[in-house]
Design a protein with these regions (language model features):
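Acidic, surface-exposed loops and disordered segments
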Residues: 1-112
Length: 112
């Protein structure tokens, strides 16, 4: 969300470096690596009392092109997402999304 990022005191663009990506079938692991890094940043921000939101960029070609142009990124860096960080207007109570029926043990037990 470009409007949100423009108003925030901080935005972090998480990029995959294709010069360091694995070869062959493992090449797309950069998405998982960057996603794990993103989640760690979100958790750290929350732990510091900051608000944060993960805004997706990749695999949208239009979004990737816009971020690449704005930041003058070289071709080997692919922007996965932008993390917008700021100060929340109020404390939000976490939602309890736990549902026992969403858990399966040893095999999938849900609707086929």
């Amino acid at each position: 969300n470009a409007g949100m990022a423009a108003k925030a005191p901080l935005a972090i663009v998480v990029c995959g470096d294709m010069n360091k990506a694995l070869e062959g079938d493992a090449r797309e692991f950069w998405v998982q690596d960057c996603s794990a890094a993103t989640e760690n940043i979100l958790l750290a921000a929350t732990g510091m009392g900051l608000g944060s939101v993960w805004t997706g960029t990749y695999p949208s070609k239009e979004r990737c092109a816009a971020v690449t142009k704005l930041l003058k990124l070289p071709k080997f860096l692919i922007p996965l997402n932008t993390i917008v960080i700021g100060y929340p207007d109020s404390q939000v109570t976490p939602k309890d999304k736990w549902k026992q029926e969403n858990v399966s043990y040893n095999a999938y037990e849900g609707e086929q």
